[in-house]
Amino acid sequence: MRAPMPQKEQAPRMDTSPPEERLEKQNEKLNNQEEEMEFKELDDLREALANLRGLSEEERSEKAMLRSRIEDQSQLICILKRRSDEALERCQILELLNAELEEKMMQEAEKLKAQGEYTRKLEERFMTLAANHELMIRFKDEYKSENIKLREENEKLKLENSSLFSQALKDEEAKVLQLTVRCEALTGELETLKERCAQDACQAQAREKELLELQSQQACTHTKKTEQLRSQLQTLKQQHQQAVEQMAEAEETHSSLSQELQARLQTVTREKEELLQLSMERGKVLQNKQAEIRQLEEKLEIANEGRKHALERFKQEAVAVDSNLRVRELQCKVDGIQKAYDELRLQSEAFKKHSLDLLSKERELNGKLRHLFP
């Protein structure tokens, strides 16, 4: 029988344990493998002998002997190959272990070098610290001696000051007491003045509130009047819009009646003359109204100046006089002046509106005449 071919064993995995332990484990594995191989060889030889003994005389021919020799040689070749593979694996493992040991030796050498450098630096620092400590001890001794000298001099100076400046200090203390008494009296006067100022401020605030209330009432009346004027302005705008619409309608009718205008040319010329006379009369009226407006503006300016003077006089009299009757009289005067001012302002605005209406009507007439007589 041919012996089974031994399979090539896998290379052992690298262990992360230290190199000495791995080397011992590898040696143990190799020894165990050698013992197993020897036991296997002995078993194979025993099987071969048993096979030879069991053969018959006929089978023990030359051919059988050659076959057995060939098988034996093949087994020996396999054994030698396996041993050579094992030796090669051992060499590779030893080379790896040697490389790891060399790397560790280099690392340890670098660590030793760094540690030597660190110890050298520590020695240098220790020497500098020792020198600094000696200097500090010397400085401390010098400071103690100087401190003792300065204390002795300070005691001497204290004795001299107490003997020389005692009377002067007493005089200064008396002056300080006088000044403190005077300061207290002045603070009392200051408090009384503050109270008076507070009372005056309260009175002034009350008067100011009264004046503000009066001004607010006047402002309310003024706002009401302005709202009325705005409503009037709105109505005038509506009337103007209606007039514009009427003008648009008139223009439409004018386009439709363009043929009839030729027949009524004579009547239109007469109307033109009448309109011219009317425009002349209205121009004169406008000039008169403008003169009246100027007079009213002058009156307004005079009234404004009188109002300003009255307000100033009212403020002065309100500050000087505390009686309520005088304040009411002045307030009545101010109200009368304000009413006169408002009436004059309304009259001036009415005249201005009337003059503007006359001017707008004159412009409309001129526009109609231009359309009629291009």
Curated annotation (Swiss-Prot):
Lineage, uppermost ranks: Eukaryota, Metazoa, Chordata, Craniata, Vertebrata
Primary location: cytoplasm
Originating organism: Macaca fascicularis (Crab-eating macaque)
Entry GO CC: cytoplasm; nucleus
Residue ranges that the Swiss-Prot or TrEMBL entry lists as coiled coil: 19-350
Protein name: Coiled-coil domain-containing protein 89
Subcellular location field: Cytoplasm; Nucleus
Residues covered by region (Disordered): 1-38
Residues bearing the modification Phosphothreonine: T16
Superkingdom to which the source organism belongs: Eukaryota
Family assignment from sequence similarity: Belongs to the CCDC89 family.
TM regions (residue ranges): none
UniProt keyword annotations, A-Z: Coiled coil, Cytoplasm, Nucleus, Phosphoprotein
Biased composition (Basic and acidic residues): 19-32
Subunit structure: Interacts with HEY1.
